[in-house]
């Protein structure tokens, strides 16, 4: 359980269907209380229990670093000393999420949802104000109608090629998305410095727009866009595949390598009742949110995307990031080798 906590908050991908107010913080504290109880029952593991408690209360540096894949849940966790990433998928073996009177809008929560955490407050109580068709990392249709409410045992993905390979520090996760007439090959490469996200062979049989969300999180500062070597605040900007585009917010950078789309921020108001029916319909919440996404158009055929997320970075680090050879360390360099229907790969020299 230590892997899914970050700064005493539980990762969204591991909240299950209970996306209630302050769920991340409450479930984080609940875990610490349970661990403290275990310490009184089994003193042989006191060091392990205390390490989890100390880390999440900020008494000690983050531990249990590296990458781990929960293959029975189709979830990848990547932990570094100053940031964490979590990826959730579904397959023909794994039901990725469920609903009922909880998680009413969570239809796409297991279609490649990628969250990155630095201070742990990136998505706090964002759920009533989310565009649930732009969950970070997800490729899906953009419809005007209400998101479908799932049942308890509803399969979400017919794809079987879903999994991960890693050496404990770096790794690659892949997902074949086959759902509702939409097909995509999605891949994520996790390193100590960034997450490289690839999408290929995206096609659908529907006239609905298809988007891939890069990010949708709380706006804490101005959203910045690098233009002619200078960072400028933007509220709404479109980007194309003509050249790489760099964005920055708070402590995280985003570099779009391939694909056209939009980056914008706005104020939204939503209802907690739309997420969990236990809340009254009068209970509104307003949040400032920023969003980055790719627009693949209608009836896409062989569409693709490439982007990088650089958590726990600075403006200067994102501005200077060398795209001709992604920096893994001083001795090793890598580049995107392929991102097609036949192969998605990254070549790392010196391995």
What is each stretch, according to the model?
Residues 2-351:
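Extended polysaccharide-engagement surfaces of secreted carbohydrate-active enzymes
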